[in-house]
Amino acid sequence: MNNKTSNGDITNDEPTVGSKRSWTDVNYKFCEDKEKQVVEEIQTETSWADVDWDSVRESIAKSITEKETDIIGEEDKIHHEDNAMDYWDKFYKKNQNKFFKDRTYLHLEFPELNPLKITRDETFIFFEDDDAAAEGAENGGGGGGSDNLYQDKDDLEKQEKEREKKMANLLSKNVDIKELKNRWVKDIQELTNDESKKLTVLEIGCGTGATVYPLLKLNPEKYFYVFDFSPHAVNLVKSNSLYNEAKLNAFVCDIATEQIPTSIVKDNSIDMMLMIFVLSAISRDKMHAVANSLFKSLKPGGVLYIRDYGLYDMTQLRFISKKGKKIDENFYLRADGTRTYFFTTQVLSEIFEAAGFKTLVSKYDTRELRNRKRMISMYRVWVRGKFMKPLDNENTENNSKILSIYNDPINNNNNNNNNNNNNNNNTTTTTSTTTTN
């Protein structure tokens, strides 16, 4: 029978093993012979599982990307560089705040953003009153579609099953939901009143607020600055009923072409920074200037948290099948005129270390995504990083309070993995990580 792949192409005769339908690895679709390959030995049908991005699969992905030859012309490159803001502004005008789901999963990845110590199972309860339950915890990606709101019936059914599963997990542990919520109310009050834990957070590329508003609820003791180079996106943040200047300041800034205004954010004043699927939208040759600008605003001891697209992600392989989409090495043009870059951990670390940051964590997060209806297996690859501005040993009062507040989880967390990454990472070697998402 005819079947559609996730990319919309029609294929004939679903492969079978014996009398059973079998899973197909969608990456093989891009190979020269165009034949779909059966994924062997899939024991379960668990979607969004951590996987080992093994050398065989990486070799296939690398051989595919090396065959790319069509690069858009210089005139088109200049046009999309000069009009990058306009294309994103059009994107937000078209989609408003309805494209991306709230990212209610970042506290699970970065414990410094989880002062209430909310677990994965508790997350959907914490956010359920906001109609933003824990879908994000399963769908962990960001810009470009992995956490967008356009979902089919199968997606919604899966999410409902996940909610039921998590509720069952809590009940099996004899968790009293009412008592849990009362505890959060008490903890929030204590955090808000504790002057020693008041930190400042800056989000670079805030979009419509899909990151900042969940984090505001989770981090009542922190003050947030957020900016975007799309005026329409910033207006959407400000029009949100939760916008409160006592807790949040949103403004327009193009980090790729200008410094962060010191009239709003003073140098050496920020404790934490967030770049969630933002750096990839900037031209590679401007990333170093961006890192330098962020370094100036961050306090000594402050930390920059990054999540973005990794090399050989499923979406990169999709670009390869489309002519006229490659701008430069690992840099592509979307249909709507926006752009995206795919990182290695080595490149990510080099960018920020050159600006003076210390790499604390730089690793891959690889996931297998299975579509049961179409029986296809796809792979997402992200990079996740933590970069610290070195401490000021001469004047310790200038240093951020992050390390003391959180008992230095940044340096203790995944320190061995970070050392391994620094020693072993290159553009042709990726590693699987077990991360919350």
Swiss-Prot record:
Record bears the keyword Methyltransferase: yes
UniProt induction comment: Up-regulated by phagocytic stimuli.
CDD domains assigned to the protein according to its UniProt record, in alphabetical order: AdoMet_MTases
Residue stretches of biased makeup (Low complexity): 411-437
Record carries keyword Coiled coil: yes
Renumbered residue ranges of the record's region Disordered: 1-21, 408-437
Entry-linked InterPro entries: Methyltransf_12 (IPR013217), METTL2/6/8-like (IPR026113), SAM-dependent_MTases_sf (IPR029063)
Gene3D superfamilies (UniProt xref): Vaccinia Virus protein VP39
Positions in coiled-coil regions: 146-180
Source organism superkingdom: Eukaryota
Keywords attached to this entry: Coiled coil, Methyltransferase, Transferase
A Gene Ontology BP annotation from the UniProt entry: methylation
GO MF, one annotated term: S-adenosylmethionine-dependent methyltransferase activity
Task of the protein: Probable methyltransferase.
Family: Belongs to the methyltransferase superfamily. METL family.
Protein name as catalogued: O-methyltransferase 3
Source organism of this protein record: Dictyostelium discoideum
